[in-house]
Amino acid sequence: MLAAVYKSINLGKVGERMVDISTEKLEELENEVTSQNTKLKKMEEFVSPDKLYQELIQSVRKYHPSADISLIEKAYRVARESHEGQVRKSGEPYIIHPLCVAIILADLELDKETIVAGLLHDVVEDTVMTEEEIAKEFNPDVALLVDGVTKLAQLSYDADKVEKQAENLRKMFLAMANDIRVILIKLADRLHNMRTLKYMTPEKQKEKARETMDIYAPIAQRL
């Protein structure tokens, strides 16, 4: 699913520098992201985090009817408390983002630990919670996934050195992620972030769009 969505929003040949990304192209990019995934459309209809959480559980139940959701429920509670008071540029409560990331991962029918890590993927970077606390509260596997996503988020991207740096970053991205699930969480994170592209400044929109096309889309297509 992720590869198909990222492929659909490709604005140019992989590896070639995009000379210009117009406002129309940015709008097209956003439209493609949402139109290619019905779940993303459904997410926009939910305002309450609790309703989104129920959507997540329903998604998990579809491929794992007998799943013990206690760990997922705990992760939702911890993530909601950790991100309390934080809002996204869209004005939404921040918890909406990790919930939507988790739903995308559930659409891929990933294991419980990946869903939990999706819910917690920003807590180390954006809150006072530590990797050690995640390992203690959940398990070492979840902590390693969250740590992997956090480290990938620290990779810097210079839009002025696209072609050479993009390939190097893709290699670093894949090398740093010892577990394929880390990459899937990061791709789901970026996919949902593209939904709120319009709330960023024009300069930031171009930066994120180019980064998505040069770094994330090629990786998604390799999976």
Predicted region positions:
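Active-site helical microenvironments for divalent-metal-assisted chemistry
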Residues: 2-223
